[in-house]
């Protein structure tokens, strides 16, 4: 009975925690970027996420040390003094596992995303369509009696603690899943290390697969499984659990004689909803427009070859896209109102840019640099279209206080990074199409300079390391990242105040603004009282 209660509590933890999550990730190979870096991203979209950011320090551990295994371990715990003080918040300690002799420093927020070796990752949780009897059977087989102990949070934490390459990170997570079982809803992860970009998927139980994308390729995932093929003879580019095919055969989910190609995504996590497919279409079309992909297609290529080299700024704009210039442009939907509010929570289309994004993370990893300075991530709070991003490294000595200040469930705070960005974002909504131009005019020139300066800082730090001055190199990137982040925060807060004054009531400088012509047309045709008066 006690075991049943514990398992029930785990199930409630996992599925209630994940219910509001819906993230988008992209991955870009080194030959597809302007600076020959690998790039992986994560738009962490959630209504409840703990936005605080910590650096978990690297350590050496005595022989026989163990590590706590916690379900939902990133749910309002305090990691400010971890591991001396273990506060897992709403997480549940379920077991212990042997600890590695050495662990690496990494960034820990709602998810963990890059370590000091330059291994980075994001995640996107699967949807699962149960509209047919076979799909209902599959779901029940995987999740109906699932006693696994591994979820996305502890899997990524452990991988980042221990892995020095993307391939190693995936193998670590795969080994954990095979030994302890995957409890979460399914996940797609983009994992990179400067040389390679991998896509890993965890389907539940001990089932998983991964594929390396070509170095000149671009990938996107938007809340559904994407790996639709495994070459079982290509061990250089594919990894998978031993039973990835046999489980489907033994349980009547797929047959060698069916004539249907083996597709883990179609078998273990089927979903064809526009909620996911439209974002896939949009991201792929932005980088390879000449493919003329069908916006209503059910399946898209796992990757495409971008028609130009991509920069961090290009990727940021993809992360902030809301179908501009297409028939699905959110700023031209009725829900956008008279001033084109692309962040209205009630839009019928789901775009990559989203009002409830907790943070956007863009890992920008150059393999030619030494580990302490190549582990660069560009980080910003809130919707990508209306936020700034700033360079951070997990080798930094400390983060500014505003990264660990405040909560979504507490009062607005001007000393909180997330609240400051949310202030600008929410202010922009009063007259979005005008305000967002001001945001971009304020942000983008600064970012253009910052991209150049950051690369110079990395090169200088790399030279210091080459000369045996690693401490000085880390001091350099730490000071640069810290002061840059503080400057952004202070300037953004002041900018938000100016924006608020400019766009009070949706006016501009206290002058009313004419609504869009298309909006006027809609209003002319709308009934005076759409809800009958009683």
Residue ranges and their predicted role:
Residues 23-152, 172-306:
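A contiguous strand-loop segment
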Residues 246-376, 380:
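Glycine-rich, aromatic-lined ligand/substrate-binding cores of catalytic
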